[in-house]
Amino acid sequence: FRGWYGWGEQGNVLEAGGPRYLLATMLGVTAGRGNTVAEIVQALTSAASADGRRPRGTIYFLTNGDVRTRARSGPVKGTVKAIEAAGVKAEILEGILPQGRRDVAGLVTGTPDFDWPASGSRLVPGAICDNLTSFGGVFTPNAGQTPLSAFIRAGAAGACGTVVEPYVMLPNTGANSPAAFQPKFPHPALQLHYVRGACLAEAFYQAVRSPHQLLVVGDPLCQPWAVIPAVEIVNAADSQPVEPGATLAGKIELEPRASLPEGGVADRYELYVDGVRVAQCGLGERLPLDTTALADGHHDLRVVAITATDIETQGRRIVPITISNHGHTLALTVEPRRVRPADTVRVSLAGAGVESAIIYGMGRVLGRTATGQATIELPAELLGRGPVTLRATGRTGPNPADAVNAPPVTITVGE
């Protein structure tokens, strides 16, 4: 999935036209019976650590007498065979949860209530847990049924649940009566899409026909079984890798390179400067970059390699660089580096060829100066909590090349 792809009725990518799909999840829910911020951060950190690691574990499919497992039991055996054919262990168990299994790489079950700690099982990083029940996505107190947040608390990379009773009205002897509707829940092939290398969001939305009542929570980009390209950025002028801290000037060409195991190939490359795509090329081609049109000073250079597969797995390398064309410099100093929310931070600028400057962080302007030499004080409570990165840009005119970026400084706000 990419934001600009159009799709046909049979799931084929169209040259033009067709609906576009922008995949999304909730990173976490803190309201009601949701998770604490610490639990959400821990789960997201664990999920990010799983990317491309091909975890050694087993995906478990639970079956029991409950209609919640019978509703989608038909395709389970075929899904298990396909997962095993992809080189990942899968197993069908009787019960509600796997008991005493320390290698749970994924879970499909169906039950109104469960107690994960009592199972004695352990989730490996990157696991998707899916429980078919009516109110898994309802977090209000006393709603009944165990919410999906129990899986996030246990370390799942993602889970889902419906936010209302997922009934559909079906004809029944001449009268409409409610019945559970399996297409409102993920098909068991959710886990198959995942082990074939799709990211979490791609796996979920390929597996659900009617997701309008379904809340998906977790890391949308987690991709434990993806084969991720290792990327190198080479300066064509001297055939040397562009290393962190490198200084670049003038018009240059970059040679993107990617290596993959098992004979894989990356056939497309994209170049980003500070998160903005500025060039793209094919296999064996170069990425042009006119650094004279950019601000002097600090920039993040990113090259993304895209594999020649249906999933189009991406790998990337991000390199902080310095651009030096116009003689402008700017340094940013922040003290102290660790501060309590009730305290103040001192932010100092020292620039050459700078007429004014802006200090910003967390997407907000925090201060402005009329010169390139200045010190301002900021209440730490304005910066949020945890690691906070501050940046500064100086200017001598209206054009991008009339600016200079200071190297960013990261501080920690907390008790």
Q: Would you name each region that the model predicts?
A:
Residues 291-297, 380-387:
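Surface-exposed, short loops/turns at beta-strand junctions within beta-sandwich domains
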Residues 269-271, 357-359:
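Short beta-strand elements bearing conserved aromatic residues within extracellular beta-rich modules
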Residues 299, 303, 390-392:
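Hydrophobic/tyrosine-rich beta-strand signature of extracellular beta-sandwich/beta-rich modules
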Residues 277-284, 366-372:
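Short beta-strand segments within Ig-like beta-sandwich modules, predominantly Fibronectin type-III
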Residues 217-249, 255-262, 320-343, 412-415:
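Short, compositionally biased P/S/T/A/G/V-rich stretches that sit at domain boundaries
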Residues 1-251, 309:
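Cysteine-dependent hydrolase recognition
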Residues 306-312, 395-402:
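Short, solvent-exposed loop/turn segments at the edges of extracellular beta-sandwich modules
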Residues 262-266, 350-355:
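Short proline/glycine-enriched turn/loop motifs at strand-loop junctions of beta-rich domains
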